[in-house]
From Swiss-Prot:
The gene is tsf. It comes from the Bacteria. It comes from Dinoroseobacter shibae (strain DSM 16493 / NCIMB 14021 / DFL 12). Disulfide bonds: none annotated. Associates with the EF-Tu.GDP complex and induces the exchange of GDP to GTP. It remains bound to the aminoacyl-tRNA.EF-Tu.GTP complex up to the GTP hydrolysis stage on the ribosome. This is Elongation factor Ts. The keyword Protein biosynthesis applies. The keyword Cytoplasm applies.
Length: 291
């Protein structure tokens, strides 16, 4: 029987299995859908799919640097306990290294590591460890010099926050300090020019409304808005922030004094933007008993 794309999609929808696993299951069972589901179950792959409905908000960010390029990847798990597992950490490290040669997240998932695709490795690990896991995102950065930093490191090159900084000029240690600053201060952008105009305008409108509530003359209000917007921009842009190493300088001034220019950065934190569902113990037990 011909294994069509429609059959593969149907099996993937039923089980959550990866494309290659679904195709292999159908091939092994001559296109018999129910037998293919059973085949996946015996291999632990349908079991992995069943876990995919659970929230994976813990995990690690892994970073890798090579030849003026760097990458950060986020791999999530359901619990911090699994994030401390040596097998999980080895997987994160291998994904980060593989990401250096991948163009985007989809390409990374299809990249082979040790004879298996990244997507297959992840599915296998879900089945063996018994928790839902996701390869959530990757970001790349290139430059004359690229520096990485990991905050709350669980192992070499991975932790709860990963930072990449691209510089021009000779890095004399300032790069690592800037990366540590980014981890702590969480700037929204490199400079005002890189900020989303909608974000700036929204803040401006908020400050206008606040200033007008004061009942002061319009010319005074205008000065208040200018001052408050200047403060806002200094707080959210990397170059405008007070440098944590020396608060008397902005990060931009500190970079200039060190003879470098910051050309870009990436800050990735585990679980940011994921809504973690909290269940009480009784609800969790009831859910388990009800299958």
């Amino acid at each position: 029987m011909a294994i069509t794309a429609a059959l593969v999609k149907e099996l993937r929808d039923k089980t959550g299995a990866g494309m290659m696993d679904a195709k292999k299951a159908l091939t092994e069972t001559d296109g018999d859908m129910e037998a293919a589901v059973d085949w996946l179950r015996t291999k632990g792959l349908a079991k992995a799919a069943k876990k995919s409905g659970r929230t994976a908000a813990e995990g690690l960010v892994g970073v890798a640097v090579a030849d003026g390029a760097a990458v950060a990847v986020e791999v999530n798990s359901e619990t911090d306990f699994v994030a401390k597992n040596a097998e999980f950490q080895a997987m994160v490290a291998s994904f980060a290294e593989a990401a250096l040669s991948a163009s985007d997240l989809d390409a990374l998932k299809g990249t082979e590591v040790g004879g298996k695709t990244v997507e297959t490795i992840l599915t296998d690990k879900i089945a063996t460890i018994g928790e839902n896991m996701t390869l959530r995102r990757m970001e790349k950065l290139s430059g004359e010099t690229v520096v990485s930093y990991v905050h709350n490191a669980a192992a070499d090159g991975m932790g709860k926050i990963g930072v990449l900084v691209a510089l021009t000029g000779a890095d004399n240690g300032i790069g690592k300090q800037i990366a540590m600053h980014i981890a702590a201060a969480n700037p929204a952008s490199l400079s005002e020019a890189d900020l989303d105009p909608a974000v700036v305008e929204k803040e401006r409108q908020v400050q206008i409304d606040i200033a007008r509530e004061s009942g002061k003359p319009e010319q005074v209000i205008e000065k208040m808005i200018v001052g408050r917007m200047k403060k806002f921009l200094s707080e959210v842009t990397l170059l405008g922030q007070a440098f944590v190493v020396n608060p008397d300088l902005t990060v931009g001034d500190a970079a200039k004094e060190a003879g470098v220019e910051i050309t870009g950065f990436v800050r990735m934190e585990v679980g940011e933007g994921i809504e973690k569902v909290e269940e009480d113990f009784a609800a969790e037990v009831a859910k388990t008993m009800n299958g």
